[in-house]
């Protein structure tokens, strides 16, 4: 039982890693990282940028509507956190600024983000509740399992919404096609009748 629980915990830990990225930011440019986040989910992150005299980097976190959730200027090393209000694609942007008289060079930026259950401090929970190490691991396993179930439920819901949207779109396209064919048929009939009357008036046909 113990070995099975630890094995499952190890597997879940492998498929639920921290989001870590490192990149080089050219001078006077910006790079944005986007990720879909569920509603009412805590997001935490740590960043560090290489120091270049005379150059500065700002960061800003915002949603698709442009609402600013977190920002800071002239960053070097630090942390940030924000809470998502709705399911949305959130982005974190790093912006390089170099004076016109200075020849800029690329700066190295490293970012580590955590969200949802990843942000919990299980060591603190274990100490506060006086839990044994195994009980703390089982608590982490339970939270990870619940989080995965919620993610799959959300994915299924979004799949159903997209399928409903596709079905509605297909129905509208079919209706529009039938309507267009009826209009063309009506126009063709009107043209035939009009030309028939015209030719009769000109006595070109009987």
UniProtKB/Swiss-Prot annotation:
Organism: Drosophila mojavensis (Fruit fly)
Cytoplasmic side: 194-206
Name assigned to this protein: Transmembrane emp24 domain-containing protein bai
SMART domains associated with the record: EMP24_GP25L
Keywords for this protein: Developmental protein, Membrane, Signal, Transmembrane, Transmembrane helix
Keyword Electron transport: no
Any one GO BP annotation for this protein: dorsal/ventral pattern formation
Domain GOLD: from-to ranges: 30-140
